[in-house]
Amino acid sequence: RECAVQGANVVLGARSLQKLQLIVGDIRSKGGEATYCAVDVTKPEECRNLIDTAVGEYGGVDVLICNAGLSMRALFDDVDLEVLHRLMDVNFWGTVYCTKYALPYLQASHGSLVGISSVAGLHGLPGRTGYSASKYAMTGFLETVRIENLKKGLHVMVACPGFTASNVRFSALTADGSSQGETPRDEAKMMTPEQVARIVIRGIEKRKRLCLMEAEGRATHFIKKFAPGFLDRMFYMVMVREPDSPLK
């Protein structure tokens, strides 16, 4: 929605056809231009179809925002390995597939490739091994794509929101792969998706490499450089105080 407000032609991709139709309808009712494509980002052929839809509708791709995400909340001791595979499939491979098919168009437009990572992609979060690993993988992948395209005018940005009041928190996987269904944190104290979207758009406009949000993201990035052991202890204490923390 925020991109459409800025005048962009928007192509949305997600698994829920009903939600896609509602959002696109809302954008169009307000004078924006948008279309959609149902896509499961764990399937490369569906990611290709998403990019083909964008090119067919609007002639190319200027910005690709890889925002599909899945989280978890369980100790590595307890978690089923299939949960970790699922997280990598969505968070990492979904980014790889969409980038692969969009890259020629982004190179042609000197456009922007954006990965929505996390504070968990800056420093490991206890109880989120698979999530942190997938976000670190995303970051390493995007940084390498940036370097490979230094002479081609491609902008690559890694955006790292903190805790955000979004559906990803309710769909976070537990040790056995079931959704946790509720969040242990106070949603009212978190950033809203709309706030995150506005910050990401500003980052794209400024062609930033790394887009940190809120004090926690900036502090994590800074403290890790000078006191990583302290940061380990701080993250441990934050997580152990969560209601029903798996660390207890």
What are these regions (language model features)?
Residues 99, 134:
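Active-site helix of classical SDR
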Residues 17, 38-49, 81:
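The beta1-alpha1 cofactor-binding region of Rossmann-like NAD(H)/NADP(H)-dependent oxidoreductases
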Residues 8-22:
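Conserved glycine-rich Rossmann-like NAD(P)H-binding loop of the short-chain dehydrogenase/reductase
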Residues 75-76, 80-85:
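Substrate-binding pocket helix/loop in short-chain dehydrogenase/reductase
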Residues 151-215:
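SDR active-site lid
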Residues 123, 144-155:
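Active-site-adjacent segment of SDR/Rossmann-fold oxidoreductases
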